[in-house]
């Protein structure tokens, strides 16, 4: 079975980012990148049932 190389590359990148995040952060709900005067924040809103 052949796989699309683009899909495989995207999957590897996503797994790498997720692994890096799990190793360096205590939570996956908030992720912030700062570069000088710029900041990018990704927040996940979730509620418990």
Swiss-Prot record:
Disruption phenotype: Partial loss of Obg-controlled persistence. Coiled coil: none annotated. Its main location: membrane. The keyword Membrane applies. InterPro entries: Hok/gef_toxin, Hok/gef_toxin_CS. Keywords: Cell inner membrane, Cell membrane, Membrane, Toxin-antitoxin system, Transmembrane, Transmembrane helix. It holds the Pfam family HOK_GEF. The lineage of its organism: Bacteria, Pseudomonadati, Pseudomonadota, Gammaproteobacteria, Enterobacterales. It is found in: Cell inner membrane. One of its GO terms (biological process) is dormancy process. This is Toxic protein HokB. Toxic component of a type I toxin-antitoxin (TA) system. When overexpressed kills cells within minutes; causes collapse of the transmembrane potential and arrest of respiration. Expression leads to membrane depolarization; when protein levels are high enough depolarization probably leads to lowered metabolic activity which in turn induces some cells to enter the persistent state in which they transiently survive antibiotic exposure. Its toxic effect is probably neutralized by antisense antitoxin RNA SokB, which is encoded in trans on the opposite DNA strand. Belongs to the Hok/Gef family. The keyword Transmembrane applies. It is a single-pass membrane protein. The chain crosses the membrane at residues 4-24. Induction: Induced by GTPase Obg expression, which requires alarmone (p)ppGpp. One of its GO terms (cellular component) is plasma membrane.
């Amino acid at each position: 079975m052949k796989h699309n190389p683009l899909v495989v590359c995207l999957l590897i990148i996503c797994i790498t980012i997720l692994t890096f995040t799990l190793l360096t952060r205590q939570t996956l709900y908030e992720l912030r990148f700062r570069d000088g005067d710029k900041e990018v924040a990704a927040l996940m809103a979730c509620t418990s049932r």
